[in-house]
Amino acid sequence: MSSAIVVSQDAESLGLQIYSRKEKSLGVLVSNFLRLYNRDDVDLIGLDDAAGQLGVERRRIYDVVNILESIGIVARRGKNQYSWKGFGEIPRSLDELKEEGMRERLGYSSSNNSDKVSNGCEREEPLTLTPDDQENSSSSKMDQKKEKSLWLLAQNFVKMFLCSDDDLITLDSAAKALLSDSPDSVHMRTKVRRLYDIANVFASMNLIEKTHIPVTRKPAYRWLGSKSIAERGLSLFNSGEPKRVFGTEITNLRAKRNKTYCSSIRKQIGYKKHDEENTEQESKPAASKYVFGPFSPIGASKTNNDKVGKGRLLEIEALASTYQPQYCNQEITGLLGHFTEAWKKWYAEVDRNK
């Protein structure tokens, strides 16, 4: 129980999604795997360590590395160990797959890959099991048996896009072309599900795009290619915070920041709209100060209003001096200075005429 909690905390610290086989697809697991190991300091990947950090069974990590190995991102180094090659190896691997696929179409292939996929041949010699693995020997043999099948099925699926003139390829057509007919319907459905998992993985990496046939509306996949997949990998599967996409609006964030800053400045300079007493005097003047013939206020009220006006003007000048922008343009700075001097002269002249 405690180990599960530690794995969950590690996944949260890396910004990975908590993986559940019943709720999440293999594409999510691959995305988490790439975010975990897509770093310059990673050279060797241990499958047991990856399974522990991602909180999944080791056989699921086998699925991940076999699909990634089919396009060159990782390479097998030893038992339960893979070396990290990175996204830069994808273009070279795709070129090799295309050349191999074209040779197979011309009939120069020395073996029948569809038979290999159907029979599930092993890609390497049987490995000796340790005492810890004896209890899981049956499942390990099944993993080794389907290892070649999944790796080869992923490569053949990519070859269909590289060597075909069709813009869209449906999953049904891919299954008919890649999977040999089997009398066992359950076995055939399992192979189709594996092909669907492979398609989801490549779609999560932006190697292909899931779409549909315009006429029949049947699900299909479009090849996106490897033109910039090396660069996209650095941005899609890194552990840092996502960058703001060009064109997104950030004005509201800056407005809120400026609003907070302005509020703090107002408190520092003691800015106030009006005193309560002055407001009450202005809104409720004495009735004796009004002449009801021409309905005009008397001179005593005018003197009081002049004092209030001077106070407001001083507050406005203090606020303007605090928020005076630091322009780099000398012409604009001189223009603002001209307006400031004109305002001071006008105010002094008005004060002398009173």
UniProtKB/Swiss-Prot annotation:
InterPro entries in the cross-refs: E2F, E2F_WHTH_DNA-bd_dom, WH-like_DNA-bd_sf, WH_DNA-bd_sf
Listed GO CC annotations: cytoplasm; nucleus; transcription regulator complex
GO molecular-function terms, A-Z: DNA binding; DNA-binding transcription factor activity; RNA polymerase II cis-regulatory region sequence-specific DNA binding
GO terms for biological process, alphabetical: regulation of transcription by RNA polymerase II
Annotated compartments: Nucleus; Cytoplasm
Polar residues bias locations: 108-117
Family: Belongs to the E2F/DP family.
UniProt function note: Inhibitor of E2F-dependent activation of gene expression. Binds specifically the E2 recognition site without interacting with DP proteins and prevents transcription activation by E2F/DP heterodimers. Does not bind retinoblastoma-related proteins. Acts as a growth regulator but is not associated with changes in the expression of cell cycle marker genes or in nuclear ploidy levels. Has no effect on cell proliferation, but may repress cell wall biosynthesis genes during cell elongation in differentiated cells.
Protein name: E2F transcription factor-like E2FF
Lineage of producing organism: Eukaryota, Viridiplantae, Streptophyta, Embryophyta, Tracheophyta
